[in-house]
Amino acid sequence: MDFYSTSFTIPRSIGASSFVTETTNPNGSITAASSSSFSLEAPRPGSHVGARTAPTASAAPEPPASSLPGRFTSMRSRFPPSVKAFMPSAFGGKRTSDRIVEAVGAEKAEADAATGSSSQPVKAEPEQSAPLAPIGERGNARPSKLVNPSLANMDDNGSSQHRDSRSTVGTRSSFDISSAASFTADSTAASSAIGVNSSSTTHSASNSISANHVQQDRGISLSQSSKDLQEAIQKLSSDIMANHQCLVSFASVPQNDESRMPPTPLSHPFARQSSFSSLQSLDQLPFPNPNGSSGYPYQQYHPQPIGTPDSHSSAFFPGRAAGEALGSGFPGLNSSSLSLSSLNPPASGSHVAQEVGLSSAQPLRSPQPNAIGASRASLSSMPKPPQYNFHLSGGYQQVMNARGTILRENPFKSTSSIKVPRADVFDVAPASSPPAKESIKEDVRRKLDEVQTATGATITLKNSEVRGADLGYGLETERIVEVLVSGTFESVELARVKVLVILDEIAGLRSETCEIDYKLHNIIGGRKRCVVQKIEEETGTSIYLPSSFLGTFGSSLASRNDGKAVAAHQNQIHITGEFFGVQRARDMLFQVSMHKSKGIISRDAAILPRKLDWMLTDRLEELRSIMIDNGTFVAFPLLGSQTSVISVFGDHRVNIERTIRSIMQLACQFYVASLWLLPVGFDVYMPSPQANLNPTQVAPMLKHVANASGAEVVFKSNCFEIHGLESEVRTAVSALLELELIKSFNFEVRFQIELANEHREFISGKKNGKVNKVMKQCGVRIKFETFNDYNFLIDVSGNDRNGVLQGLGLLQEELPAEMSFHVPEAYHKRIIGVGGKNIQRIMKKFGVYVKFSNAEEFAALGGYLDNEDNVIARTPAKNAANLENLKLSVMELVNPKDKDYISETVTISRRYHRTLLGEKAIFIHDIESKTSSSVRFPARESASDLVTIFGPESQIHIAAQMLLDHVPFEAEFRAPNSTELGDAIHSAEFAALAEQLKRDLSISVSPVIEQRRPGGEAVFKLRLNRSNTDFLPTAKDAIEDFLINRNANIYAAPSRTRSDSFASAFPHFANKLISTAGAAESNESFNTAAAAAAAAAEQARVNERRLRAAASTPDIKALFDAPSQHLHGGPGFASSNGGSAATAANSPLITSPLYTSPYGNGRGFGSDVWGAPTRAFTASNASNATPSLMGLPPPSVGTPGAGLVSAAGPGPIGAGVSVPTSGGIQFPSQPSLHQQSGHRLSDEMHMNRGLEGMSMEDRVKALRKPRSFAHRAQSLDIGAMAAQQASQHASGSMSVGPSTPYGLGPIGTGAPGMSGHFPGMTSSQGTFGGGAPHHLYQPPTPQQQAQQQLQYQQQQQQQQQQQQQPGYGMPHQPQHFHASSASISRLPPGRNTQNPDSTTMDEVSRVLAQLAFDRA
């Protein structure tokens, strides 16, 4: 019997599960919990028990930047892994649909990263009796021994990161929009870390509660130690040796062997994938910078660069103790499919974090600003997850059977994470209780126990966040809890669907199941699940299909339940929704299945068994994506069974053929190499003792090479076989040829590459020119072999090590690099040109072959790399950089609205998908038609939040923003529970307030109070559209004011730093239009006491004022404000500011001929804005000087204020009252003696009083007094004051003469009828310049005061006579006196005229402003 030995390392994909070192609680005892229990994790702040300092961090070197343009990274391309390995600079990023993932926000991600980097390691004791629980998963295959872990992700996922666009890689990860979990960019993206926090409450099925009170900040759960892992592997090895009669040895992979082989600048020494770096072109990736301003219309979704320490540093935990061993997952050794983890993009998830097996779903909060850099620097010092190397030897069949058993029954577990609202699963906890003391709702506890019993999975509830994301002003997002499902692959898949159904039931939906053959599920769903989405849209339901891989990894349920459980679960489809919708959806599914089942066809295809095992373990998400994209089902053999046939089921030949082609293309990434050892000289009569190697000598070499490279290394009959990815195979061959034992032999190296048949002519060239050139240049032999109907094999062999590797590299340069994209068929003829001249010129220019597919060809192919792609470009890999240039040239002839069709993903919480697809389907279809795009929702069973939008690049962001407008936004704030609060909430006034908020601000308020226990907190949930988020503080303040007025306690509002804003530049708008504060502070510099008054008012406003002061920040208004005293004369008047006239001259603001300043309306001062520039007027003692004599043109006849005098003082100028002289509307003015007579509008508006005449308390009140909506409107609405003035004219209080029908006298004379309104005004006083200037103002003499009193009495008598006239209206109505004003009508306004509507007011304002400009 030939001796066959193989050595391989598991898990290939690091991070699928974890086993952490043993730790003890503060008492030194080991805590335990029932193995059938699910637990509640709640991070608790406190001292670190048993903490130790992390190893010294070393900074990670920066990779070189890529020279490629940014747009090159967004192309959809299909490059063989060998091509990518040879051209690292040509492959810098992922397609857009894989890059764009939701983050909660850049601020939150930075805060999470800071906490993650600053946290210290804690040793916690695992639960001894609990089942093995995974901690973290990662998706790509690569060895754990990295010289520089910061470069770990550079070569991780060569082929998967730049996979074709069919894949949904990176869309299955264990987090969602509100979570902080890990995101993997690989197709094998595994779920994020799980486990039981050291401070956790664990309950079993019997509802017994046990608490572990170990203090640990990161909240990493330890359910089994590394010692238990080793014991489990030891038991597995013993069972295999007993059952399969072969020798099995295993050893933990050492963590320091990588130092033997130094890394290259761009890759670590033993790359698991091609050696291109996703970090190279990070600065040119075509998505917004998360740290800067985003060009996307939905900026709250900051795209995260994938696989880079900077972008995912929030999930790094550099402080992990060196002794803590983190394992990796396995049933796919990647387990990405097992988890929702790759489905939901995290706010702070990390690809690298999953690679090192860390959980990012931790409470990450830290104030340290340098935490992100520290976390990146400390990445290189982080311990690697444990890997185990298995060495099997014996007969071929026995060894292969043992290998399959190890792949299926390894002790590594899978993890899936679902983010749910905290209120759905937890009771409202009292305010004083710590998070770990929160209790799970009894019905939720019972249902989760039932799921555990039925599936064998372990369910953990974990508080990933103590608080929601801070929205400011005491508001936060909804608090989230993680439901972590861990166990074997099939257990996790089944339990996840059941948990999702339970969550829908908690939300009040009805659920039902229906039985349909599992092979029909994807066929019923259609391409990209279009049929299922249509059913969900019409019925308003959620349809959960089971996993397509049940039974592939070896069923643990089958062994426990006589093999019946898997068959039962494979066929179950869960439907949730409203009762009648569920019934309709069930009937429609049965109807479609009956129709589809009549036309099912299948086809078999052959693939090498090791390639099948690799795809099932490392490319599970790629396979899932292929099936969903094509609407087919692929029956894979049992993992490790050495079966080489797959069966593809579908309802259309095109879909089946495209599925097989895609799988075959995926298999081309896996290489096989062989190293044949030949003796130096062979003598048949005297055989050399060294002709054959002793298997005992080979075993250490196999282990070393397998550990170093990550490939599977086999030795049989003096021949080494290496199986793995291209970079792994290259590394392994180089390592073997360096061994001293091998150098004593002659050898022949052979590389076997698999390629699609359609590329056979492309790679050979004309008359095999390309192949002959490589063979002649490198001295190698290249041979083509037929393999199957879809692929062929290329053998590259030679006896010289350097020649063979060089020949392989040159051949890789000739391998095809493809890129496909979508161009509307209407443009095909225009691009191709007459006789193909246009496209031939482009092809010749860039050396790229292009093919356009019309509708018939497209239907026959089913699309290229993506379902919608109808143009494909192909060129040798050495010319791959020109693919993007060719695409740009082709797209120049396409209209912007139709060019660059791409796929973007928008993160929308999973719970809104059913409503959006059902109730709001009409809006979605409208968005699709307006933007020429299509919206696809993810499969419900994946619990993904990523909604895909496919459309032109110029329109897709508009479509995303329009879609987000229909997504509700939820925020909440809390208040201490009390009897008064309960009474206030249940009162009719609160219902009226809620109705008013909903009507005025479009915000729905839902209070939640726990009535079953004393104390606790009341939660006020505010639900609104994203466009109304500016009104959140207003609604919160209204609710809190309502509670305060009813003696209910509330939490103090957090003090916030002031930020620059332009909000107070628009105080005249009501806050229903623009959310502004009632009164903005003054930006003026008061003199002495005035400055102190302003400072006191500002401090009082910050500390006491409850309404949000959006207008209280420095703004552009400061540029236009008036001098400190705010007393302005009209044109030709000197400024009386209590100082020199230079104050007014230096101010950028001058009096306006348009309208009075709106800023004076709500303060104790007034100011004018936006006036035409005028020259300063020098005061003169001449009493009869006219404006023309002073160097100023005289005002036009009829100009408002032309014949008015200043009321600033007695005599010719002023009567103690400031009369605005700007054009437009004259605000009310009253003599000072009338201020004690009664309430006036001008008093309320503080138009006549400055701050200098007020006490300190009055000044503060004046600054803080909010203005009413009516006064705000008066600030802007000139027509409103015009109507009041018209009323004055109609009442007769302002006389209208025949020569001046509008109450305006000629220039230089007093206006008729004005003497009764302004005491102290005489004909001589009506002239400009008459009397002392403002800055020479003298107090009134006793004679002047007596004269003013007499005139005032005469005025009162005249008013009484007018009020006694019949038809006057309301005789006792208070009269407000306005200065005369021009009217746009030639007739006097009628009496008792109501104010016109707002549109009329706007028109009046516009006309008045135009007239003023015309006259100027």
Swiss-Prot record:
Q: Which GO MF terms does the UniProt record name?
A: mRNA binding
Q: Which Gene3D superfamilies does the record cross-reference, listed alphabetically?
A: K Homology domain, type 1
Q: Where is this region: Disordered?
A: 25-76, 108-174, 196-225, 255-320, 341-385, 1215-1240, 1289-1416
Task: Give residue ranges for domain KH.
Answer: 412-504, 508-594, 747-816, 817-892, 900-968
Cite the record's Polar residues compositional bias ranges. Answer: 357-369, 1219-1239, 1391-1402
Locate the coiled-coil region(s) and give their ranges: none
User: What is the documented disruption phenotype for this protein?
Assistant: Affects cell growth, pheromone response, filamentation, cell morphology, as well as pathogenicity. Leads to increased levels of mRNAs containing the AUACCC sequence.
A Pfam family in this protein? KH_1
Example of a GO cellular component annotation carried by this entry: cytoplasm
InterPro entries assigned to the protein according to its UniProt record, in alphabetical order: KH_dom, KH_dom_type_1, KH_dom_type_1_sf, KH_Mug60-KHD4
Q: Does the keyword Secreted apply?
A: no
Q: Where is the composition biased (Low complexity)?
A: 196-213, 273-285, 341-350, 1343-1374
Could you name the domain of life of the organism this protein comes from? Eukaryota
Going by the UniProt record, its keywords in alphabetical order are: Repeat, RNA-binding, Virulence
Query: Sorted alphabetically, which PANTHER family does this protein's record hold?
Result: KH DOMAIN-CONTAINING PROTEIN YLL032C (PTHR10627:SF76), SCP160 (PTHR10627)
Q: Domain description from the entry?
A: The tandem KH domains 3 and 4 are essential for AUACCC binding.
Give the function comment from the record. RNA-binding protein that recognizes the sequence AUACCC via its tandem KH domains 3 and 4, probably in order to promote mRNA instability. Plays an essential role in filamentous growth and virulence.
- In Swiss-Prot or TrEMBL terms, this protein is called K homology domain-containing protein 4
Task: Please name the source species.
Answer: Mycosarcoma maydis (Corn smut fungus)
Which gene codes for it?
Answer: KHD4
